[in-house]
Curated annotation (Swiss-Prot):
This is Chromosome segregation in meiosis protein 3. One of its GO terms (biological process) is DNA repair. Belongs to the CSM3 family. The keyword Transmembrane does not apply. It comes from Aspergillus fumigatus (strain ATCC MYA-4609 / CBS 101355 / FGSC A1100 / Af293).
């Protein structure tokens, strides 16, 4: 009974008391005044400069890495005249490039084009073979390459005999001493003594053997005369033989006569 009395006391006594439970206006106005005003469009608030730089978190500023562009290789005059360029082509062509000759024209042309293609691929791999040849042909009209081309052609030309003698004379004059090579020394003698007479040159030597050797060197026909004087021909040998080759000498006749006289005297005494 007492419990029932307490339950009855907890129940609201009137509808006015029940309406007080839904009365939420007592502190809401104060709470709305304390909260900051938010933007109406719903965008977040801008962070301060300290937050943007990240210094508040102990972080450095953002570093922007810009990738450097590598220079593009070009097929120009400097690349052609460098060691991997035309100088390498000239060296390897002398050692490795061989042609079969007449009757093998097509195979020789194919071998030459293949040789050029391998060289151009090593020199400038970016370009195709036809494009590389067009670039090289255009660069060949420059003054620098034309001068180098003329110099290379002059190097491959065979030298004349006079130029070789001049080189020998220059080398002997620069050395300042007599060369040990007899060919070089003899060539220098002929070139240096062209303006002198043969008698003056032969007179510089005291002995007859040296004079004879110099005269033979200056006059090649003298060697033939010298040989004729040293060696006799068959005709000369026959001409020099005496006619009375089988007849004995006078001394032999006297000896024979004395022997005959002695024989006669011995026979007479017997």
């Amino acid at each position: 009974m007492e419990n029932e009395g307490t339950l009855q006391d907890d129940r609201p006594a009137s509808p006015k008391h029940a309406g007080d439970l839904f009365d939420y206006d007592f502190a809401l106005d104060e709470l709305w005044q304390e909260t900051p005003n938010m933007p109406n469009n719903g965008a977040p608030m801008q962070a301060s400069a300290r937050d943007e730089s990240g210094l508040g978190l102990g972080l450095d500023e953002e570093v922007k890495v810009t990738k450097k562009r590598q220079p593009v290789a070009k097929l120009d005059e400097s690349r052609l005249l460098s060691q991997p360029g035309i100088p390498k082509l000239r060296r390897t062509a002398k050692k490795k490039l061989r042609f079969k000759g007449k009757g093998h024209e097509f195979s020789d042309a194919a071998r030459l084009l293949n040789f050029y293609q391998l060289w151009l691929d090593d020199l400038f791999p970016r370009a195709k073979f036809a494009d590389g040849l067009a670039i090289i042909e255009r660069l060949g009209h420059s003054k620098r390459l034309q001068a180098m081309r003329k110099e290379w052609i002059d190097e491959e030309k065979p030298k004349d005999a006079s130029e070789n003698h001049n080189d020998v004379l220059k080398a002997s004059e620069s050395s300042g001493s007599q060369s040990d090579d007899p060919v070089v020394a003899f060539g220098g003698l002929n070139m240096a003594d062209t303006k002198r007479s043969k008698g003056d040159i032969a007179g510089d030597y005291t002995s007859d053997a040296e004079r004879m050797r110099v005269e033979v060197n200056l006059n090649p026909s003298g060697q033939r005369k010298l040989d004729e004087g040293l060696f006799m021909t068959d005709n000369d040998d026959v001409a020099q033989q005496p006619d009375n080759l089988g007849a004995p000498d006078d001394d032999e006749l006297d000896a024979l006569l004395k022997e005959q006289e002695l024989l006669l005297m011995n026979n007479a005494s017997a």
